[in-house]
Amino acid sequence: MAASISSRSLLDPKSLPDALKMLRDEGPLTPLAGCTDLYVSLNFGTLKESRFLNLWRLAALRGIGVRRNTLTIGALATHTDLIRSPLVRKRLPMLAAAAREIGGVQSQNRGTIGGNVANASPAGDTLPVLAAADAIVVLQSAAGTRRIPFTAFYTGYRQTVRQADELIVAFEIPPISGRQWFRKVGTRAAQAISKVVIAGVVGKQPRLAIGSVEPTVIRLPKTEESIARGVDVAESQRVLISEIAPIDDIRSTADYRRRVAANLLARMLSGD
């Protein structure tokens, strides 16, 4: 049964400072923007939050640019923005590839990278990309700004270090050297929740991150080190299998995830 929205309240800030002040003075509030996940929860009657902060019209959280040779992506950049951005396609093509895999066109037009990250689902398609890219999450409150390495942002299943008075305002991605790679495996070819999702960089400093396998997205430093040493593919696959602890859930089994992850690693290393 769909949940009623009549008992819920929505605050509508006109600027980022206004939003941060509301979080400080009128919280707790749940930030929202594209609402692609919120509406699903509302329709299924599982939405627990009752007070929301509308970020959708805050221009300060939009935009994609380069500052001091660092790619900066506003938290309200939509997946369509990521797909179309020449800067993203040039500097972080694996993020554009991930954005193409998220839902249908309507979800891509409304869903934001900040929402995908804040939702903290281990199956989020952009998460392995940001982990493999050594991205920085920029958090802001009325008291100031914090920059958190993406790999330190998640503390558990759907849990993050973001405080109640903070907003994700941007992501900072340093230059990447090497061939970037992204793949997602789901129940069907499109509009599917990931069973396994991998992003990586093949080069002098290999990088590999995997999602929808453990309670949070993870980097695989032992597998990265094996790739850097130049061992054969089978050995790197063995290292990967020993490094992950896949979960069983309604979407897949641990054994399936283990085998798929190893196969995807082989495809990444072969350039497929």
Label the model's feature ranges.
Residues 1-272:
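C-terminal structural segment of proteins
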